[in-house]
Amino acid sequence: MSDSDDSNFSEEESEHSSEAEEAEEAEAEEERASAAGSEKEEVEEEEEEEYDEEEEEEDDDRPAKKPRHGGFILDEADVDDEYEDEDQWEDGAEDILEKEEIEASNIDNVVLDEDRSGARRLQNLWRDQREEELGEYYMKKYAKSSVGETVYGGSDELSDDITQQQLLPGVKDPNLWTVKCKIGEERATAIALMRKFIAYQFTDTPLQIKSVVAPEHVKGYIYVEAYKQTHVKQAIEGVGNLRMGYWNQQMVPIKEMTDVLKVVKEVTNLKPKSWVRLKRGIYKDDIAQVDYVEPSQNQISLKMIPRIDFDRIKARMSLKDWFAKRKKFKRPPQRLFDAEKIRSLGGDVASDGDFLIFEGNRYSRKGFLFKSFAMSAVITEGVKPTLSELEKFEDQPEGIDLEVVTESTGKEREHNFQPGDNVEVCEGELINLQGKILSVDGNKITIMPKHEDLKDMLEFPAQELRKYFKMGDHVKVIAGRFEGDTGLIVRVEENFVILFSDLTMHELKVLPRDLQLCSETASGVDVGGQHEWGELVQLDPQTVGVIVRLERETFQVLNMYGKVVTVRHQAVTRKKDNRFAVALDSEQNNIHVKDIVKVIDGPHSGREGEIRHLFRGFAFLHCKKLVENGGMFVCKTRHLVLAGGSKPRDVTNFTVGSFAPMSPRISSPMHPSGAGQRGGFGGGGMSRGRGRRDNDLIGQTVRISQGPYKGYIGVVKDATESTARVELHSTCQTISVDRQRLTTVGSRRPGGMTSTYGRTPMYGSQTPMYGSGSRTPMYGSQTPLHDGSRTPHYGSQTPLHDGSRTPAQSGAWDPNNPNTPSRADEDFEYGFDDEPTPSPQGYGGTPNPQTPGYPDPSSPQVTQPYNPQTPGTPAMYNTDQFSPYAVPSPQGSYQPSPSPQSYHQVAPSPVGYQNTHSPASYHPTPSPMAYQASPSPSPVGYSPMTPGAPSPGGYNPHTPGSGIEQSSSDWVTTDIQVKVRDTYLDSQAVGQTGVIRSVTGGMCSVYLKDSEKVVSISSEHLEPVTPTKSNKVKVILGEDREATGILLSIDGEDGIVRMDLDEQLKILNLRFLGKLLEA
C-alpha cells in the first residue's frame, strides 16, 4: 500500500470515528506525515490543485442563485480573494464555531454529523494553515448556516430594512394628491378640511378622503390622501383657499410618497468657540464655550466658570459639622479658580502641564474649568451669551462672536454681504483673491475679481468669502456690541479691525464681518431713539450724568462725580432741559450753557471748554482737545472762570425781568432786569433786552479779527450795537459775529470796531470797559485819587435829574446831558457807605456828581501816582475847584457792557487798593464782545490830561495810568518768569525770580525757585523778566496775547519773534513779551 493510499484511508476512517478517537488519529497522522517527507507534500498539493480546478469548473456551469437573506454574504464572497477579507474571516472563526456548537443540539442528526465533520476539517485546516482551504470552508459554512436558519426556522426576526419595506405604500393603498393652496394658509386649510370631514362624517355623503398633510417646508400646496381624484374634488369643493387647485390635482408617485413625511433629524454640528448652556446639575443654565467635540463618544469638552463651594472645603478640612453640612445643598456662586485660596483652606491642588488639578477636575491657569459632558446634557440651539457673561470669559468681549449661529444640516449659513462690499476668498483654489460684490442671491455671491487675468464675474458660496478693509476706510458697525457707530479704520489686524469712532473718539475693536463701508456719520442716537450722545440723564434722584458712549445694550455715563459708569437703557431717565440754567463761576460771573470757560482748579485745571449742561454746582464741559470720553468732562462751577465769554444766545428766549442776578455787581442793560422795570428811558435809556439796528455798518466789508473765523472777510448784512450778521466771501456762509471782533477793511485802526452807541467806549479816557458793570470808576480807585467828588474818568457823575438823554440824541459836550451808564434799580445793590452826595440842584444848576459803588476814597492807597486836575474848574463842594459844566461820558450810555461776561474781578483786591487802571487799558481776558487791539503805551513819562471825548482827528489820548505799568494785572499770564518787586511785604521773597503757575483775578500763584515754594502774590508786586536773544517768549500784551515764539534778535526796544503757530516773523515791543521757563 502506497503512502497516498494510507493517507486516504486515514482520512476516511477519521470522518466516521467518534470524537474520542480524533485526537489519537491526529497524532498518528502527524507521525506518518513527518515520515513521508517532502514527497508526500508535493503529491497532496497536486491533488488539491486538481480538486480546486474541478470545483471552479462546476461552479461556472452551475447557474447563480438569488440570495434569500440580503446581500451581505454575496458581497463577502465576491471579494473573498482579497487578503484583508481573509484576515477578517479568520478573526471571526472562533465565534462561528461556538455558535455552531450551541445550535448543534437543536437540529436533527444529519445536520449534526455535517457540523461535526466540518469542525474536524476546521481543526485540520488550522493545523496545516492552508489559506485557500480556510477561505473555502468559511464561505461554505457561513452560507450553509444562513440557509439552515432560513429553512429550519433558526431566526424569526427580520432586519429593520425588511421591516420598513413592508410598511411602504403599494398599489392597493390610497394615493397622495397635491392640491394648490393659498400661500401661508396651508395649516389653516388642513384644519378646515378636518372640520369638514367631521361635519360630514355621519351624513349620507361623507368625505372619502383619508388624511390631509401640510408640511412646514412646502409652501402653496397641501397633500390629500384618497383613492380617487373625484374623492379629492368632493372634499375641497367650497373651500376658498383651495379654489385655485380645484380643477387640477396631481398624484404623487408611490416611490415619492415616503419623502413627503420624511423627518430629517437635525444633527447639531458644534464647533470650537461656539456657545452652549447646561441643562441640569450644579451648572444649570450656565454659559459654556465649546473646547472640542468627540462625536464618536458623544461627548463634548466645555470651558466654563467653575462653581466651587469654599465653605464645604473648609468644613471638610476641619471635620466640624461635616456630616450635618454635607446634606445641605447650596449652589455656590460662579468664580474663577483660585489655587492660592484653595491651598490656604487646606485643599490639595496638583499641576499637570498647563492645567491645575483639583478634586479630579482640570482648571486652566486663568481659572476656567475644562470638563467633559454628554451631548444630551447641553443646550445648543439659540444660545446667545449676554454682555456680562462675555466679559467674564474675555477682557475684550468684542473679540468673541456675539451672534453665534449654530449651523445645522440643510440650513444655510447666515451672512451680511451686500453689493458693493470688498471681499476676498478665504477658502478653495482662489484663496486671497480680492474682488467686489456685484449681486447677492441667497448663499451665492457674485463678485468681480480684482485681477488682471480675470475679467469675468465669479460666483462663490458665502462661506468662502470674507470682507476686507484697508486703512483709511470709513465704515459703519452693523452688528455686535458697537452696532450703529461709525469711524475711520486706523489699523487692520488678522481677524480684527481697529477703527476710531467719529462720535466718542474711542478706538473700537470689531470683527470685519460686522463692518460695512459708508460715508455718513453716526447720529449719536440709540437704537430706541430715546437717548443721544452728550445727553444729560438722571441715574438716581441725586445723581445725573452725561452719556459718553452708546452701545447696543448699555450706556456709558459720565456722572457728576467724574466716574464713568455702565448702565442699561432702562436704568436712566432723560433729564429736563436745562438750557436756561445759570450758575456763578469762581469770580461770581454769571455762566450759562454754551459759555466758554477755563478751569482754574481741580483735576482738569488749565483746560478750556464749552458748557454743555449745568446741574446744581456741577458743569459738564466739552473740550475738542480732549480725547477721553469724547471730550466730555465734569468739574465744579467754582473751579471755572468765564474765559472768552459765551456764544451768542437768543435773547428772545429771555423775558424782561426774568432773571435777577444774586451778585450786586451784575446789573447792566444787557440783562434787562434793571432798566426794563423803570418803564422809561432812565437808567441808561431804552434798555429793552434787544439791540437797535445799526444801518451805518450794513453793507461794509469787514474782517474778523478774533475767534474761530479769524482772518475771514465778508459783507455785513445786518447789525445791531452788539452783533453783526456777516456773509463770508470764501464760504458764502452768513454767521453772527460780535462787533468787537470786526475790523472795517481799509481802516487804519488796528483794533476792533466801536459801536456808535457807546456800548463799549473806545480806548482811552472813556467809560470803563466790559467787566466793570455799571460802576465808575473801575477797580475802586478814582482819578484823582483823593477827594472823590472830582470828576474821575469822565462818566462817574450821575445826575439825579434829566437822565433821559443819550449821546445819540445830543452832543457829547452838552452840559445838560448826563452820559453815565445805567445804574442798578435796587438801592441795596450799592453799599450804604458810598460817597455821600450833596443835595440835588434844580434844573439848570450844577449837576450833582455821584460816584456809586466804592468806599470812601480817602482810604489810604498803596501808591499815589500823579493826579491830573481838570483844567479850568472852579471850586465846588469839598474841592478847591469845580467845573461849571457836567462833563459827559462820550458814547457811553445806550447799553453799557454786560456784567456777566466779564472775565476779571471787580471787587477791590483783598491786599489793598491797586493803582489806577485806565478804562482803556488792556484787560486780561475780555469777553468776545471786547476783543480790542492793545493800546500803545504813552510815549512820555507823565500822563496827559484827559479830554472828554475822542478828538475829531481820531487821536485817542490816554488817561492817567493807561501806560503799561508793571503794577497793572493785564499782562499777567501763566508759565512766564517774573520777579518779585520791592513793594511786597515779605522781604525774603523780594528780588526772587519765579514762574507763574496760575492766575485768579489779580492774584498769581508763583513758584519761587530759590525758596522752592509756591506763594500767592498780587500782580502789582510782580514784574515780568525781560527776555534776551534766543529765549522762548510769550506775548503778554497786544492782539497776539498768549502766543508763543522764539526771540531771534533785539533792536532797541523791539524784538523780532518767530511765532510758533504760523512760523511768521513779527516785530513786538519787548514790554509785550514775557520770558518762558526753559525746559
Swiss-Prot record:
Residues 849-858 have a biased composition (Pro residues). Residues 173-267 are annotated as: Interaction with SUPT4H1. Residues 1-30, 41-61, 75-89, 826-836 have a biased composition (Acidic residues). GO terms for molecular function: mRNA binding. The keyword Nucleus applies. Residues 753-784, 859-882 have a biased composition (Polar residues). Phosphorylated. Phosphorylation by P-TEFb (CDK9) at Thr residues of the C-terminal repeats alleviates transcriptional pausing and promotes transcription elongation. Phosphorylation may also stimulate interaction with PIN1. Bulk phosphorylation occurs predominantly in mitosis. SMART domains: CTD, KOW, NGN. Residues 836-942 are annotated as: 10 X 8 AA approximate tandem repeats of P-[TS]-P-S-P-[QA]-[SG]-Y, motif CTR2. Pfam families: KOW, KOW1_SPT5, KOW2_Spt5, KOW4_SPT5, KOW5_SPT5, KOW6_SPT5, KOW7_SPT5, KOWx_SPT5. Interacts with SUPT4H1 to form DSIF. DSIF interacts with the positive transcription elongation factor b complex (P-TEFb complex), which is composed of CDK9 and cyclin-T (CCNT1 or CCNT2). DSIF interacts with RNA polymerase II, and this interaction is reduced by phosphorylation of the C-terminal domain (CTD) of POLR2A by P-TEFb. DSIF also interacts with the NELF complex, which is composed of WHSC2/NELFA, COBRA1/NELFB, TH1L/NELFD and RDBP/NELFE, and this interaction occurs following prior binding of DSIF to RNA polymerase II. Also interacts with SUPT6H. This is Transcription elongation factor SPT5. The gene is SUPT5H.
